[in-house]
Regions:
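Helix-enriched interaction subdomains in cytosolic or periplasmic regions
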Residues: 1-13
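Soluble catalytic domains of membrane acyltransferases
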Residues: 3, 17-193
């Protein structure tokens, strides 16, 4: 496995996508304390449908390595199944035709996008240890993490109602191993902003 390196910018493909988005979209309001952003931190944010991760990746002034659903790092068919059945149908609430179309298109480019942002896959089982280890490696080279902790099994909400505690476990594990408190910083994005 390749060693984790400090990341200061996205690859050329993601920079191009970001430039296109910034050209056609009005800059949204992101709620966070812009003063004294730490060198490395765990940023937690609401997903806000499909828009949250993309918006934060494009407009946040710091490079963030996101946690994400593990099926999105697998082969095309598994990505498509996750996108169609879980992401678009269950979480976003789209109809069958729209979900099929979007899952088919996004399934094609998603692997390239997620590899470009160095997505750390998260798991609902013992493999989460791999996610924690990879996260600590990123923090050790001063890469900040972006985690969407909300429980989205009933769909995405504008405000987080309940959340998974993986980010707290990660912060505790980091402290146990490194004797350093890692800042946990909340971000908020509202797609109507």
């Amino acid at each position: 496995m390749k060693p984790v390196k400090t990341i200061t910018k996205h690859n050329w493909f993601l920079r191009l996508i970001k430039k296109i988005i910034r050209t056609v979209r009005v800059t949204p309001k992101l709620a966070f304390n812009q003063e004294n952003l730490p060198e490395k931190a765990i940023y937690i944010a609401n997903h806000s449908g499909a828009a949250g991760p993309l918006t934060l990746s494009v407009y946040f002034p710091k490079y963030l390595v996101p946690w994400g659903a593990y099926p999105m790092t697998e082969n095309y068919f598994r990505r498509w199944k996750y996108l169609y059945y879980v992401f678009y149908r269950q979480k976003i609430g789209y109809g069958k035709i729209r979900s099929f179309f979007l899952a088919t298109l996004f399934g094609i480019i998603s692997k390239t996008l997620y590899n470009g942002v160095k997505l750390i896959p998260t798991y609902p089982d013992a493999r989460l240890k791999t996610s924690i280890r990879k996260s600590i490696e990123h923090l050790e080279v001063n890469n900040s993490l972006l985690i969407f902790p909300e429980d989205s099994s009933g769909g995405y909400k504008e405000e987080i109602e309940t959340f998974h505690s993986g980010f707290v476990f990660l912060a505790n594990k980091y402290y146990q191993e490194k004797q350093v408190h890692i800042p946990i910083i909340p971000l908020f994005y509202h797609k109507a902003s």
